[in-house]
Amino acid sequence: MENKNNFKFIQGSVTVGDDIATIKFFDSVDAWSTSSFEYEFNYLTEYIKPSKIRVLINSDGGSVYHGMSTFSSILDSKIPTETINVGLAASMGSVLLAAGDVAKMKDYALIMLHNPWSRGAGSDDPMILAFTEQIKTVYKERWGFDEDKIKEIMDGPEGEDGTWINAKRAVELGIIDESNVIKTEPQEKQKVEAAINSVESKSK
């Protein structure tokens, strides 16, 4: 057994042969976060070998270059993966969401898709154009978008940087299956009041 304090991304203690292992990506996508995540993700796939790896995502995005290696690690995992947007999957964070065998999201979570950019580089810069096509390929192959649709979403409304997508819209677009939207449960006080009201209504 490994103590959870030994890890930055793996959640809880893990034991060889666990049913489900959970690992989080709660960070911007950069050289440190991706290399650290991949080290621990590979530890799960090569040593722990659980039946499933659950990847929790809350990320504002970041580097396409570094993010694609993390996308590939999740995508190519021999162990089934489940990516869950628990808050925000923006920019490269949305690419990580697309890597899982199954993608889920909280009903309050958000996805944001836009065109890549870099300081000092225009939209017609060869590197930016190449990164744009790379990301489009991911969205088209993983989520079934055609060229016109993904261009519309990544461009966003006039004057905006891309498109913000809530859970309802994600279902409409086919990004998330309706059954994979995780509902927010009411607080305990509300549950008790609802139960009391139900009993009272039945007694009338």
Label the predicted regions.
Residues 1-92, 99-204:
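N-terminal organellar transit peptides
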